[in-house]
């Protein structure tokens, strides 16, 4: 499984619970550096390269009370996460 401090390439699709796609992004990140929301950081450490997981993230493990420019505050989200 992926280790803290390991650099990985991820593909992440973030959706509202109604299925509306909000963000589709590919990134290189370092696991455990808090570069991602808490829900993603926790799941990454349980995954292996090539795996895909579906995460249902409550707002407090996602973008919280502030949200982002495209994600409203207090949004519960579905995240499809792949380690490439």
For the regions a protein language model found, what residue spans apply to each?
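A beta-strand/beta-hairpin structural motif
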Residues: 16-79
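Beta-strand signatures of extracellular beta-sandwich domains
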Residues: 9-15
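Short, glycine/small-residue-enriched coil/turn segments at secondary-structure junctions
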Residues: 1-9
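Short beta-strand-to-coil "C-cap" segments at the C-terminal boundary of structured domains/repeats
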Residues: 80-84
């Amino acid at each position: 499984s992926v280790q803290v401090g390991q650099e990985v390439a991820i593909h992440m699709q973030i959706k509202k619970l109604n299925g509306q796609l909000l963000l589709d992004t590919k990134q290189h990140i370092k696991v455990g550096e808090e570069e991602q929301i808490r829900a993603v950081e926790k799941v990454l450490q349980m995954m292996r390269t090539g795996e895909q997981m579906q995460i249902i993230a409550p707002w407090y493990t996602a973008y919280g009370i502030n949200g982002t420019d495209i994600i409203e505050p207090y949004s519960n989200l579905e995240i499809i996460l792949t380690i490439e």
